[in-house]
């Protein structure tokens, strides 16, 4: 499988960017263009203006963040669709909405931007 990935990377050149979260196994890391935490990888995705396809070897929220930050013509792909993060799933919708209401009541509606994990 690694040889096939390397072959595809060679064929696609700058049209392909592979990002791997630092917890990925050594084989995935060996074919990644960048390895790091979710913030660093999102920044690398945003800075890249040549790749048509960005493969994000991480979990849903990481790929979603990269997709928000990249250009409309760039496609962010998550190779393992079942990849999830227990921390990202800790708060349910009711809890998130309650927290949002508390923040709005304390700081106002217009200047509050919650940043979540």
Would you name each region that the model predicts?
Residues 1-117:
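Active-site loop-to-helix "anion-binding N-cap" substructures in soluble metabolic enzymes
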């Amino acid at each position: 499988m690694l040889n096939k990935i390397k072959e595809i990377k060679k064929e696609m050149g700058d049209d392909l960017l592979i990002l791997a979260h630092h917890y990925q196994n050594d084989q995935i890391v060996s074919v990644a263009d960048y390895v790091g935490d979710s913030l660093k990888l999102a920044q690398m995705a945003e800075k890249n203006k040549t790749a048509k396809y960005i493969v994000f070897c991480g979990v849903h929220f990481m790929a979603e963040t990269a997709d928000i930050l990249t250009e409309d013509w760039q496609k962010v792909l998550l190779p393992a669709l079942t990849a999830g993060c227990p921390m990202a799933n800790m708060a349910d919708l009711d809890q998130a909405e309650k927290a949002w209401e508390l923040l709005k009541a304390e700081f106002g509606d217009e200047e509050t931007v919650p940043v979540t994990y």
